[in-house]
């Protein structure tokens, strides 16, 4: 399973639309779309740059809703990443209903602890939207298992502590963590943060992961080389995971 990340509106919303359509045809199994945010604590330099560019170009939520309407017919599931402050200001139930109406399958909220998510969980359950929880190498075993059981779609395992980026060193506990999660859930496990090379994809697969999430590398290629180069590169990365 290859999950490709795009920042909505970077470098512009039409390019995002084109990228979604082409990645869906070139091997992405899931496309994660990040909502630009000025205080995205989990973002490294590349994704911060992408968010800043989108916001400077005047991105607002109407652009997101229009984008989702225009790519609604693709067969690849869409997942939205947004920070809770964005969701809260828009209105939690209104936000969830909007995503479901646009055929979005999952929601990632990186700054919302599970213990503080009761309202969002209840609303998502009501409308059939999956929350995808993040599990890191520093998450204690009991909490990791609780989060794994709460995931109804796939599980996002962070390869190391810190922010997103192209840094390639994975935490040494990752293989063990994947094994422990496999004991308590049948949900697919995808590894993200720092994945940008075919060799890494093959290594992650050898650890038992069911997928990889590629964000910073996708946005770097998109911003520097364009949609066609990104879609061809994704095709190569997909073949590394599924030869």
From Swiss-Prot:
It is found in: Plastid, Chloroplast. Pfam families: Trp_syntA. The keyword Plastid applies. Its EC number is 4.2.1.20. The keyword Amino-acid biosynthesis applies. One of its GO terms (molecular function) is tryptophan synthase activity. One of its GO terms (cellular component) is cytosol. Transmembrane segments: none annotated. Pathway: Amino-acid biosynthesis; L-tryptophan biosynthesis; L-tryptophan from chorismate: step 5/5. Keywords: Amino-acid biosynthesis, Aromatic amino acid biosynthesis, Chloroplast, Lyase, Plastid, Tryptophan biosynthesis. It catalyses: (1S,2R)-1-C-(indol-3-yl)glycerol 3-phosphate + L-serine = D-glyceraldehyde 3-phosphate + L-tryptophan + H2O. SUPFAM superfamilies: Ribulose-phoshate binding barrel. Coiled coil: none annotated. The active site is at 32 (proton acceptor), 43 (proton acceptor). CDD domains: Tryptophan_synthase_alpha. Tetramer of two alpha and two beta chains. The alpha subunit is responsible for the aldol cleavage of indoleglycerol phosphate to indole and glyceraldehyde 3-phosphate. Belongs to the TrpA family. This is Tryptophan synthase alpha chain. It comes from Cyanidioschyzon merolae (strain NIES-3377 / 10D) (Unicellular red alga).
């Amino acid at each position: 399973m290859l999950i490709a990340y795009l920042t909505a509106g970077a470098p512009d919303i039409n390019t995002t639309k084109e990228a979604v359509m082409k990645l869906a045809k070139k091997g992405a199994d899931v496309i994660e779309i990040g909502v630009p945010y000025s205080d995205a604590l989990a973002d490294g330099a590349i994704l911060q740059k992408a968010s800043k560019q989108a916001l400077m170009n005047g991105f607002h939520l109407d652009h997101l809703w229009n984008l989702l309407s225009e790519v609604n017919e693709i067969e690849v599931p869409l997942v939205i990443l947004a920070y809770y402050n964005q969701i809260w200001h828009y209105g939690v139930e209104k936000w969830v209903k909007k995503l479901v109406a646009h055929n979005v399958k999952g929601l990632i909220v990186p700054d919302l602890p599970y213990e503080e998510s009761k309202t969002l969980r209840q609303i998502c359950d009501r409308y059939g939207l999956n929350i995808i929880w993040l599990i890191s190498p520093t998450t204690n075993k009991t909490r990791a298992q609780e989060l794994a059981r709460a995931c109804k779609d796939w599980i996002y395992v962070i390869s190391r502590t810190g922010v997103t980026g192209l840094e390639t060193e994975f935490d040494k506990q990752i293989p063990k963590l994947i094994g422990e999660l496999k004991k308590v859930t049948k949900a697919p496990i995808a590894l993200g943060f720092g994945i940008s090379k075919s060799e890494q994809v093959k290594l992650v697969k050898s650890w038992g992961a069911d997928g990889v999430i590629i964000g910073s590398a996708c946005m770097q290629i998109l911003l520097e080389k364009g949609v066609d180069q990104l879609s061809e590169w994704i095709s190569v990365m997909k073949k590394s995971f599924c030869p």
